[in-house]
Regions:
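Append "with occasional cross-activation on large, charged helical scaffolds in nucleic-acid assemblies
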Residues: 360, 373-644, 658, 662, ...
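Charge-lined substrate channels and their catalytic hotspots, especially those that engage the 3′ end
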Residues: 1-286, 293-339, 370, 375-378, ...
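Intrinsically disordered, Lys/Arg-rich low-complexity segments
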Residues: 711-786
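Phosphate-interacting basic helix/loop segments used at nucleotide- and nucleic-acid interfaces
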Residues: 184, 253-260, 264-282, 400-414, ...
Length: 786
């Protein structure tokens, strides 16, 4: 009977029961009762439904849920967010919908709830499948455990977002419990078991080994110092000096007065410069870069390993090089008074900073001096003793300083943004323990060399763009309007008048904002906020210009010892012009090289930040209980981030403040309900160091009331009025050296802060929801700041 009912309704769309009974010949009392029972059963099974007029209709099959692919970002409390490519807003995933996904996994999701901009809640999603696991290996100390006799013990990941234990299969060697192991994941958490299972791949070291903490971070990211045997053998075959044959066909610049300018501890000297003042008033600037590509042949073991690494990694007490030291510190280092093969960008630059003529070619040089930044800065400051020591190049140094001023002014005129922020240098002893944190100095010499490298990179990029040849660019795309708007709102909270909308905001306008706040206590913080509103620079085979530099063309040509894209640019300088097949080859390989280089660069940055946060926290462990003056660097719903003069940043959680505080999202302030004490960015406050945790890289402060406290006018106050005169304050603080960046990519800043979304275009998932995605009930509400 069911088949007959379905066939009739398919043909007639809908029908009253009496009409259906008549059509099927079921009008008799018994047959009619059977018909009604069948209809009732089909309704319960959602095979048909009653319309408002009492007629019957076949139930439509539910449209299949639309699934999306994204990256899962876990929170240590169990929930997380999924980011989708090309979308600004992430989707919230409740702890019950995570489906055993791990931080960084590529996942398949369905949207269960759309965003509500009026309420400031984010869209919500459910993970239905893990497409690819991000974590393949884990590094950590083995904990011997007899509770699970089939395993040797377990490792607990340092990543706070991974709460599950990693059980380790018994290896062939006897473990003592002091080993730091690198293990390969065999099984991931699932419905069957909420833990990992792994196999020992390597013994990294022991907990008592000096520097093991840094090595553990590097190994956990698969950043390995040792080179494969095949690579080292190839490096050994590279000669110590160029031969006469190596010099054939090269422009001989050995008679030019060229010299290197680097940090005092630099060993890989990969760039040198020369300068001449021409009769027409222009400058000739030569930027000479070690010709690494001459020794690293494409497809060789050296080349494959260099591409795999793609960049050198610089952490507190060591460098993990892209190339073996025999090359980077040997024949590819432009040491004084020895012949070296180079590739050179020789530019004629007019008094306005415009390159009017250039040559890019293979050269040979012999540098005159190995200068340090401090040497050059001293000479420019009038140090007569240094000037006498290096008198042969003093005229060149002064000409270079003049040209640097011209180039810097040119960049400012066209709208280049200056993201100068304080950088810390952490000094460690032989055991790897931090003993001091100092600020990195950027004098004229440092900025001068930067100017010369920038103009060389621009010139090389424009040269190949105009030749319309496949090329690799360093691009920095325009910022998203939403992020610029957040920066505008942030800057406006300081009383800065800003004209125009975010979508119309030019580099010159942003530059003008930063010029207005020069010298203000919040200038550095505002500069950091501007930097965070930018997109991340990356490598690409397509030229999109460089927004931050306001440059139409840009590449990386000047550091082939430590960056693979630079090595590729050198290779193209040499190979182009040989045949049409060369261009076709580069066109084919460049996309993957650009992607690999960008990915490895991000990995290196993550490693550098994690080590820096760890070492800063370790340094501050010795200062727990001490009091200092600090500056508020960020205000969020859950508290204040404050920065010490040495750039160490810590959190004052809102629960550690003495009363209830109201958070003003627009002005980014916290104001005490009773006292009116108000905290805003750039304000100086007194703090006490409460906790420093090397393992997590976290530092906690507490607030101490002081004469620095600001009370908003019109509010009851225990302290001074905001516009009152400040008394001079001089305290003899115990030593915290000058010289930290925000901890681990500001993870703690974003952990609980759910900033409301601005009204704007309809999110893409509004449309997805209309196509039949079922909405969940009882999901956690909230949105987050990325």
């Amino acid at each position: 009977m069911k088949t007959s009912i379905k066939e009739y309704l398919q043909e007639h769309d809908k029908a009253q029961i009496n009409d259906l009974a008549a059509a099927l010949g079921k009008e008799g009392s018994k047959d009619f009762r059977d018909l009604v029972k069948t209809i009732s059963l089909m309704e319960r099974r959602h095979e048909l439904k009653f319309e408002d007029d009492g007629s019957l209709r076949l139930a439509q099959k539910k449209a299949p849920a639309i699934t999306l692919k994204g990256i899962f970002h876990a929170h240590k409390n169990g929930f997380g967010f999924v980011s989708l490519e090309g979308e600004e807003e992430d989707l919230f995933v409740g702890r019950n919908d995570v489906n055993h996904a791990i931080d960084g996994d590529t996942v398949e999701i369905v949207i269960t709830k759309v965003a509500d901009r009026n309420k400031g809640t984010a869209a919500e999603a459910k993970i239905i499948d893990v497409l690819e696991h991000s974590i393949k290996t884990v590094v950590g100390q083995i904990v011997l455990d007899e509770e699970k006799p089939k395993y040797a013990g377990y490792i607990r990941s340092k990543n706070q977002k991974i709460s599950q234990l990693i059980y380790v299969k018994k290896p062939a060697i006897q473990l003592e419990g002091t080993e730091i192991l690198k293990v390969e994941i065999d099984q991931y958490p699932s419905r069957k078991h909420n833990y990992f299972v792994a196999t020992v791949r390597d013994v990294v070291g022991h907990v008592t080994d000096p520097g093991i903490d840094v090595l553990e971070v590097l190994e956990s990211m698969d950043i390995v110092s040792e080179f494969p045997e095949e690579v080292l053998k190839e490096a050994e075959q590279v000669p110590d000096a160029p031969s006469a044959k190596d010099l054939e066909g090269r422009l001989d610049l050995r008679e030019e007065i060229t010299f290197t300018i680097d940090g005092a501890d630099a060993k890989d000297l990969d760039d040198a410069v020369h300068i001449k003042l021409l009769k027409n008033g222009n400058f000739e600037l030569g930027v000479h870069i070690a010709d690494v590509s001459y020794y690293v042949q494409e497809g060789s073991a050296l080349d494959k390993e260099a591409l795999n690494r793609a960049t050198s990694v610089y952490v507190t007490d060591r460098v993990v090089p892209m190339l073996p030291e025999r090359l980077s510190n040997g024949i590819c280092s432009l040491n004084p008074n020895v012949d070296r093969l180079t590739q050179s960008a020789i530019m004629e630059i007019d008094p306005h900073g415009k390159v009017v003529k250039h040559t890019i070619t293979q050269t040979v040089i012999n540098t005159t001096f190995r200068m340090t930044y401090s040497d050059v800065n001293d000479i420019l400051a009038g140090d007569e003793e240094k000037a006498q020591t290096f008198k042969k190049i003093v005229p060149s140094i002064h000409q270079m300083a003049t040209l640097h001023g011209i180039l810097e002014s040119m960049r400012i005129r066209r709208g280049a943004l200056n993201f100068d922020t304080n950088e810390a240098k952490i000094l460690v002893n032989k055991e790897g323990k931090p003993v001091d944190i100092v600020l990195r100095q950027r004098g004229i010499a440092e900025r001068m060399i930067e100017s010369f490298m920038l103009i060389a990179n621009e010139t090389v990029a424009e040269h190949f763009t105009r030749l319309k040849l496949p090329f690799i660019y360093r691009i920095h795309e325009d910022p998203k309007a939403e992020k610029v708007q957040k920066f505008i709102d942030y800057a406006s909270s300081f009383g800065i008048q800003i004209y125009g909308t975010a979508s119309e905001m030019s580099q010159e306008a942003l530059q003008e904002i930063m010029r207005k706040v020069e010298g203000e206590p919040y200038a550095d913080v505002l500069s950091m906020m501007l930097l965070r509103s930018m997109q991340q620079a990356r490598y690409s085979e397509h030229n999109h210009g460089h927004y931050g530099l306001a440059a139409e063309y840009y590449t990386h040509f000047t550091s082939p010892i430590r960056r693979y894209p630079d090595l590729m640019v050198h290779r193209m300088v040499r190979e182009y012009g040989k045949s049409q097949e060369v261009a076709e080859h580069f066109e084919q390989v460049l996309p993957d090289i650009a992607s690999q280089s960008s990915s490895r660069e991000r990995r290196a940055i993550d490693a550098e930040r994690e080590v820096e946060a760890m070492k800063k926290a370790e340094y501050m462990e010795d200062y727990v209980g001490e009091e200092y003056d600090a500056v508020v660097s960020s205000v969020v719903k859950f508290g204040l981030f404050v920065e010490l003069p040495n750039t160490v940043e810590g959190l004052i959680h809102i629960t550690n403040l003495p009363e209830f505080y109201h958070f003003n999202e627009r002005d980014l302030t916290l104001r005490g309900e009773k006292s009116g004490v108000t905290f805003r960015v750039g304000q100086q406050i007194r703090i006490k160091v409460e906790r420093a945790d090397k393992m997590t890289g976290e530092i906690d402060f507490s607030y101490i009331p002081s004469e620095w406290d600001v009370v908003e006018k019109g509010l009851k106050s225990k302290g001074r009025e905001r516009d009152g005169n400040r008394r001079d304050r001089r305290r003899k603080d115990k030593k915290v050296s000058k010289g930290s960046t925000a901890r681990k990519d500001d993870k703690r800043k974003d952990s609980f802060s759910k900033s409301k979304k601005k009204k704007g275009k309809k999110p893409f998932y509004k449309e997805v929801a209309k196509k039949g995605v079922k909405h969940g009930k009882g999901r956690r509400k909230g949105s987050r700041t990325k």
